[in-house]
């Protein structure tokens, strides 16, 4: 059996905000099919590393590559890389004026030019996967925090990414809603999804 291939590689990455250096000469890699959990104190650069991978927070020096291609400001390359790397944030960032279904289908239709019927079919499969198929025509304000975060996961999966980044996905949730989101993440991990997770949920991290 061949060893997992490094899909994302960080090499001597540095990032500062003013005089505060958040990422200091970080070198690491994340392999296909693996789940990596990043833990540490607040302000230690965990979320910044995730955002640097997606170029949401450009790094100052060093290199980050995704599938061998450097992460830079080249628009065409960056769009392709962002399609391959899905991200789920602390806040759900759903569009309040769009239904759950339209939130999930928006990016495939706009970016991948997927036909509406095909995008809707794919979205319903994903909503079923996260247990929300019966809520497809509701709006975000009609859902609980846990349900909104599960929609956010389905939305990220709709782009058919090769890697999923989770930036403290349960930190903004009430305690009783945390488990439903972690259950979806466990299901993704069991399915072989490559995942990089920043979390304070130590029980999930130990798994």
Question: Over which residues does each language-model region extend?
Answer:
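ABC family nucleotide-binding domain
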Residues: 6-10, 14-207
């Amino acid at each position: 059996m061949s060893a997992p291939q490094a899909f994302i590689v960080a090499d001597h990455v540095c990032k500062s905000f003013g005089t505060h250096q958040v990422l200091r000469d970080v070198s690491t890699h994340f392999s296909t099919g693996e789940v990596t959990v990043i833990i540490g104190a607040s302000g230690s650069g965990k979320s910044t590393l995730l955002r640097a991978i997606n170029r949401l927070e450009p790094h100052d020096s060093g290199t980050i590559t995704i599938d061998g291609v450097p992460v830079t400001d080249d628009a065409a390359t960056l769009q392709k890389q962002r399609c391959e790397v899905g991200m789920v944030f602390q806040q759900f960032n759903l569009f309040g004026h769009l239904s759950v279904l339209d939130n999930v289908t928006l990016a495939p239709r706009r970016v991948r030019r997927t036909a509406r019927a095909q995008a809707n079919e794919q979205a319903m499969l994903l909503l079923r996967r996260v247990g929300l198929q019966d809520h497809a025509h509701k709006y975000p304000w009609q859902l609980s925090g846990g349900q909104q975060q599960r929609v956010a996961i389905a939305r990220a999966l709709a782009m058919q990414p090769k890697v999923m980044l989770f930036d403290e996905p349960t930190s903004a949730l009430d305690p009783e809603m945390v488990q439903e989101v972690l259950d979806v993440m466990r299901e993704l991990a069991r399915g072989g999804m490559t995942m990089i997770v920043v979390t304070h949920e130590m029980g999930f991290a130990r798994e």
